[in-house]
From Swiss-Prot:
The keyword Thylakoid does not apply. It comes from the Bacteria. It comes from Bacillus anthracis. One of its GO terms (molecular function) is metal ion binding. PROSITE patterns: MPN, UPF0758. This is UPF0758 protein BA_4685/GBAA_4685/BAS4351.
């Protein structure tokens, strides 16, 4: 028989998880637990290795589509949907930690709140956090997806949600898929335009945070706000 039961005792992921805890397992072993079984030709650990190699580790795997997963020999629709559901649960659990009126007192607070959700995105996402008078997050909105451009990021879309939510202030964020959070000329121009509009209508743009891979840049700290 194939699957975890066929692997030598010291490499049985489910048994190791029960005895030593999930934290003791490698990425390939955790993936094997989710997959449960291998195929006729290979063990579940070999299948795990193949999947991780195909996606160059967890970074790309977390955003894998159903089509990409089932294209791998040994991964059917059932296994693919199990993985996709597990990854989505993981993302939601990360968000739960910072929900319920998370307070932002510094650029670091803001980056911590959004880092894990945004740093792996493969396209630029422009997101606004809407805050109350106590600097607590009352709403989060993705304004658009795509390359940041002053002609695309219209202040109307940013501030419309602020009025709907009776927000006192806004923090803007977007990610750089390259992992380098250094601001571009367009990033700075968009920021200045939004800040000026905020001054006119009385809703302050507190900061614009650029998210990289475990790095971030605050345009306020850089003197652009």
């Amino acid at each position: 028989m194939n699957g975890i039961r066929d692997v030598v005792k010291e490499e049985q992921p489910r048994e190791r998880l029960l005895l030593e805890g999930a934290g003791s397992l490698s990425n390939r072993e955790l993936l094997a637990v989710l997959l449960r079984t291998g195929s006729k030709e290979e063990s579940v650990l070999k299948l795990s290795d193949k999947i991780l190699h195909h996606f160059d580790g967890l970074r790309m795997l977390k955003d894998a589509t159903l089509e990409e997963l089932v294209s791998i020999h040994g991964v059917g629709v059932a296994k693919a949907t199990q993985l996709i559901a597990a990854f989505e649960l993981g993302r939601r659990m990360v968000r739960l930690e910072y929900q319920n009126r998370y307070s932002i007192r510094s650029p670091e607070d803001c980056a911590t709140y959004m880092m894990e959700e945004m740093r792996f995105l493969q396209q630029e996402h422009f997101v606004c956090l809407y805050l109350n008078t106590k600097n607590q997050v009352i709403h989060r909105q993705t304004i658009f997806i795509g390359s940041l451009n002053s002609s695309i990021v219209h202040p109307r879309e940013v501030f419309k949600e602020a009025f709907r939510r009776a927000a006192a202030s806004i923090i803007c964020l977007h990610n750089h898929p390259s992992g380098d959070p250094a601001p571009s000329r367009e990033d700075i121009e968009v920021t200045k335009r939004l800040v000026e509009c905020g001054r006119i209508i009385g809703i302050e743009v507190l900061d614009h945070i650029i998210i990289g891979d475990h790095k971030f840049v605050s345009l306020k700290e850089k003197g652009h706000i």
